[in-house]
């Protein structure tokens, strides 16, 4: 099955990501929180991608297919079939921002909207952390301050925000944030009382907007794209 990638300047940077970064991002798209392949995944049924299973650069050589998978999840399935591809990343980002009630001005750059999203994610996650998790996070970003309001300016200035959010998304203690619970942490209130170290308080059965966007996939995916963009940018400076 083909994955049609729509040329997207906001996703072109993915070609500069490492194999590990792309493999982790692809898995976020293609597998659910139980480690099972999503039935709606197109990438996992793509013959070219499957033929490179075990190749050391399977994901790097197919970054456009991975980007196309994100575009696929960002668009309505029926609309995707009609136009032959999914949505551009910026449209997905604006959809996510609207869903999470973030004030994203269309005049803002993609980078600025992402920055706003990352900051809100970090603020809401911090509120749900116990002291042990806070200290683990501070250690992960090499921070010497203990309060979030002191930490945020440093993260912005030193380009460590992406490192911090990536730690939260990938760490075992917050694995629920990689899936549907990301919406709760961002403040949308779809889940109640789901602490970072505790069990998920409720399960989402494929939350979708009128447009058909699968937010249980696109919200954590957009967060990860924002992180990867900053990591790649930092290596190119």
UniProtKB/Swiss-Prot annotation:
Family note: Belongs to the UPF0174 family.
One Pfam entry name: DUF3944
InterPro entries reported for this sequence: DUF3944, Ubiq_cyt_c_chap
NCBIfam families: PRK10236.1 (NF007593)
The organism's taxonomic lineage, starting at the top: Bacteria, Pseudomonadati, Pseudomonadota, Gammaproteobacteria, Enterobacterales
Reported phenotype of the disruption mutant: Strand-specific deletion mutant, which disrupts only yaaW, shows no difference in growth compared with wild-type strain at 37 degrees Celsius or after heat shock. Biofilm formation is increased at 37 degrees Celsius.
Transmembrane domains' residue ranges: none
Name under which the protein is recorded: UPF0174 protein YaaW
């Amino acid at each position: 099955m083909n994955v049609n990638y729509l040329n997207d300047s906001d996703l072109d940077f993915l070609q500069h990501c490492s194999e590990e970064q792309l493999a982790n991002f692809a898995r976020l798209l293609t597998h659910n929180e139980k480690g099972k392949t999503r039935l709606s995944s197109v990438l996992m049924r793509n013959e070219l991608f499957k033929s490179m299973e075990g190749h050391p650069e399977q994901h790097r050589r197919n970054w456009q297919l991975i980007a196309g998978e994100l575009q696929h999840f960002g668009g309505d399935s029926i609309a995707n079939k009609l136009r032959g591809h999914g949505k551009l990343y910026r449209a997905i980002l604006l959809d996510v921002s609207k869903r999470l009630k973030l004030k994203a001005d269309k005049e803002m750059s993609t980078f600025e909207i992402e920055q706003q999203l990352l900051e809100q994610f970090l603020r809401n996650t911090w509120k749900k952390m116990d002291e042990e998790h806070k200290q683990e996070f501070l250690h992960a970003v090499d921070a010497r301050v203990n309060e979030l309001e002191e930490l945020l300016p440093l993260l912005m200035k030193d380009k460590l925000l992406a490192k911090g959010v990536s730690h939260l998304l990938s760490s075992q203690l917050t694995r629920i944030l990689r899936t549907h619970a990301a919406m709760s942490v961002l403040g949308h209130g779809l889940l109640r009382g789901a602490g970072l170290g505790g069990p998920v308080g409720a399960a989402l059965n494929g939350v979708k907007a009128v447009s058909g966007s699968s937010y249980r996939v696109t919200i954590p995916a957009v967060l990860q794209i924002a992180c990867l963009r900053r990591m790649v940018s930092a290596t190119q400076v």
